[in-house]
Amino acid sequence: MRTSRRSFLSGLTAMAGVLAARANMPAPRPRHDPSLAVFISDLHLNGLKEEVPTHLYEERCFCEAVGKIMALDPLPANVVCFGDISYHWGQPEDYVLAAKLFQPLLDAGIKLTLGLGNHDRRDNFLVQWPSYAKSTLVPGRIVSKVEMPHVDLLMLDTINATPVEKKKRSHPGECSKEEYEWLAATLKAATKPVITCSHHKPNEDKVGLTNLLHGSAACKGHVFGHWHRWFRDFLHVGWDPQKVFPISCLPSTGHWGDIGFATFRTFPDRATLTLHQYDFFFTGGPGDGQPFRDDIVKEKNGQTCTFRLV
């Protein structure tokens, strides 16, 4: 069968139209946004259900948080945990449960970085996640760096030397001499802005980071957990008006207090932390926060804290 010259030219014209249409189509959006991270804190997951049967709701609440994170479009490139993964004593069973509940995030290609809180124990944590013993930036502590396009996150380890045994817990935080010296050298050598992170507030107990962070040109702010409620504040040394150092506290994913997580989005000149709060309750679990729950969630959800990077 012979093709006429007219048919041949018509085919070329149609093909050119298809190619032109494809050229004008927007490129597919990446599944993960490298400028977006999610911050979670104070999970308090209970792997010993028979021993603490009244605290099973933390697992359900954390699964709800994971579902909301997985519904973000695009997905965050990073999820950063600010500690208190364990319910109370850093039991191995708590970390086994946590690893199971983290898996959907990992399966979705999200990088997970874990920090420790006062209810965690390094030895049992490292049994479940042994890679942190090699990757830590400060031997003997669990210290990590998360690199984002416009800022680096430094996750510090502020848990103290509390014994592993039950009923010998301690809420205060501390920063070891070695970690403090490492942080001072790292901030001095930094070539891009830094946000420091920890479970405890930087000026709380023996953490003692106020002067170091306030005096650093690279450090632009600090984010922490522990208090189970969202708030924004600032650090200052004396009454020096030259630098306001913003800090922000994260909610719990489901133990008590403000319930939710925060998204952290970076831009060339700033980074914005945004609260995603969808519940509030006390230690009785979901439903224990009435009649204040609706008012608190409505007032707080969507609040932001801005860190200026330049």
Residue ranges of each PLM-predicted region?
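Solvent-exposed loop/turn segments at secondary-structure junctions
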Residues: L43-N46, I85-H88, N118-R122, I159-T162, ...
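Active-site neighborhood of phospho(di)ester-bond hydrolases with catalytic His/Asp-centered motifs
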Residues: I40-S41, V79-G83, K111-G117, I195-H199, ...
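Acidic, His/Gly-rich catalytic cores of divalent-metal-dependent hydrolytic chemistry
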Residues: R270-V310
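N-terminal secretory signal peptides and thylakoid transit peptides that target proteins
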Residues: M1-A16
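N-terminal active-site segment of His-dependent metallophosphoesterases
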Residues: M25-E93, A185
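Short acidic, glycine-rich surface-loop motifs adjacent to enzyme active sites
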Residues: A185-P202
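Boundary at the C-terminal end of the N-terminal hydrophobic targeting segment
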Residues: A21-A23
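Extended active-site neighborhood of metal-dependent phosphoesterases/phosphodiesterases
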Residues: R29, Q91-W182, G208-G221, R232-L250, ...
